[in-house]
Amino acid sequence: GKPVTIVEMLPSILYGNDSDVCRTMTELLTDRGVTIHTGAKVLEIRDGLTCVFEKEGQKLTAEGAVVILATGRKPDTAALGLEAAGVATERGFVLVDDELRTTVPHIFAIGDLTGKQQLAHVATAQGIVAAHNAAGAHRTMRYDAVPGCIYTTPEIACVGLTEEKAAAAGHPVRVGKFNVSGNGRSLAMVLGCHILAPHATEMIGEIALAIQNGLTAGAVSDTIHAHPTVSEILMEAAHDVEGLCCHKL
């Protein structure tokens, strides 16, 4: 393989995700020889191949055969004539309510240009809601149960709040954890789930379903999961919320 250097301006890679997941992925990448600089600001790209960045007051460089710039997205709505139509925007994003209506009631907007969670499956869900509402219904979008997937090796998947965000929101938080390497009744509402494991992106839908329908950790732990399957780690983690995990190493 080729040497890889990651330059990240925020305090950690995957910032905003679960802290345990961020830390573990950092360790996995480092063990594979990836050089990671966090809290670093890119200053310039010289000759298309040399990255000049600043970290802790020092100017550093990283060279490579390819430079990938991944700093987010911005809306491309300037040529759509939105202002003339009376559709309000903010920093180029189209303002919509929970029913996906713009400031012009008969005009709806979906997808990345709404400035919500910029994921393909969110746009699909928004499209369904908008279509129903355009036909006279009054459906609303929920963004608290949207799963997010990162297709690394191993995969990362998450849904709902992190432990830190749940605590900051004033929820009494209990955490259940289960190590996938050990894989071969609670009244607590499920607020979030964060997985770093093979097939994580296939498993996260179960917890999205739990959050969407207000299920408890007990509902997950009481559901018999087939063995051996990777998805049974969700049952084990739910058991661990009350310290009742049978197979935790």
List PLM regions with ranges.
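Electropositive phosphate-/nucleotide-binding environments in soluble metabolic enzymes
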Residues: S19, R23, I36, T61, ...
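Flexible, acidic loop-helix segments that line cofactor/substrate-binding pockets
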Residues: P11, Y15, G39, I45, ...
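Short beta-strand and adjoining strand-loop segment in the mid-core
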Residues: E54, D112-L119, C149-I156
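FAD-site-proximal beta/loop scaffold in flavoenzymes
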Residues: T61-A134, G205-A208, S221
